[in-house]
Amino acid sequence: MENFQLVLLLIGVIAIIGVLVHGFWSIRKQQPKEYKQSPMADISRERRDAQGFDNDGIGAVRVVKNTQQDDEPETIDDEQRDPLATETVTDAFELSGTPATKVNKTRVEPSLIPQESVFATDMPVQESLFGADEISVAAPVITEQAVRTEPEPRLQPVFKPEPQLEPVELKPDPIVEPAPKQEQTEELGEPRDVLVLHVVAKEGEELSGAELLPCLLTLNFKFGEMNIFHRHEDNAGTGKVLFSMANMVKPGVFDPDNMEQFSTQGVVLFMTLPCYGEALMNFSIMLNSAHQIADDLGGVVLDGGRDEWLESTKQNYIQRIRAQA
């Protein structure tokens, strides 16, 4: 795109230069020869040669010698000497190869012709000069016919009658409601294995219900069937149940309305196999939830046999999950 703009710019500059050159050439071609060759220099030169005066009306200085000047030459200072006269006399001596003839001994004052006569004699010449060179430029005459512009013909709008269309009743398309998603109704059958985790309080302590309830809500547990908390597929508490949490003390239920007065020695998290979704992912969520409850309430995570949770125990649970896959 930039190269294309550059090419257009160069073409535009070349076109402008061509138009300017053509305009100057046309003006030069139409200009008369009298303006190209100025005859003023030749006429002034001829006028000076014939009458002895230049354009300012000053003639050549005449030098007249006196008798006393021949016998006794008078010394003239450089300041009193006329530079124009000296220059003229010097040029005359340098140009003439023959000795100058003697002039009358009487002193003759130089006679100057008034400038008015010079201009009077020159005026006819100038008038004839400009009269010959005067160029009459005919002004363009605008005729009445050129001024008159032809009136544009008025176009009368032509309206064609549009054919009347009969109203057509548009029947709305039937709204097709999306079919509700069919919930997974696949029966898992009887559970073949159960993965259990315990979160118990430290020796001599209990888990407070006032602290347990906000922790469960943060972990997206929802109170539901069998009066226990469940973890569903959706964080909003919808979908299939992934795993559940019950009270470790019989009868193993919770009362959400009286959680502030509730306390227990521990809770139990369990997940049946097979389960909905990915079993390994569900187990990972359950294990992280158990550790979070233990950290918030100051408890300890134990396995299904209430033994200390170790890395080897975790690997054993993973093998049990893969065996049921």
Curated annotation (Swiss-Prot):
The protein's matches in InterPro entries, at most eight in alphabetical order, are given as: Cell_div_ZipA (IPR011919), ZipA_FtsZ-bd_C (IPR007449), ZipA_FtsZ-bd_C_sf (IPR036765)
Keywords attached to this Swiss-Prot or TrEMBL record, sorted alphabetically, are: Cell cycle, Cell division, Cell inner membrane, Cell membrane, Membrane, Transmembrane, Transmembrane helix
Where in or outside the cell it occurs: the entry states: Cell inner membrane
Residues that span the membrane, as ranges = 7-27
One Pfam family this chain carries?
ZipA_C
Which residue spans belong to the Periplasmic compartment? 1-6
Offer one example of a GO biological process linked to this entry.
division septum assembly
How is this protein annotated for GO cellular component? Answer: cell division site; plasma membrane
- Cytoplasmic side residue ranges read 28-325
According to its record, how does it sit in the membrane? Single-pass type I membrane protein
Q: Region Disordered: what ranges?
A: 165-188
Check the record and name the PANTHER family matching this protein: CELL DIVISION PROTEIN ZIPA
Q: How does it assemble?
A: Interacts with FtsZ via their C-terminal domains.
Name the family the entry cites: Belongs to the ZipA family.
Functionally, this protein is described as follows:
Essential cell division protein that stabilizes the FtsZ protofilaments by cross-linking them and that serves as a cytoplasmic membrane anchor for the Z ring. Also required for the recruitment to the septal ring of downstream cell division proteins.
Q: Quote the HAMAP family the UniProt record gives.
A: ZipA
Question: Know the name of this protein?
Answer: Cell division protein ZipA
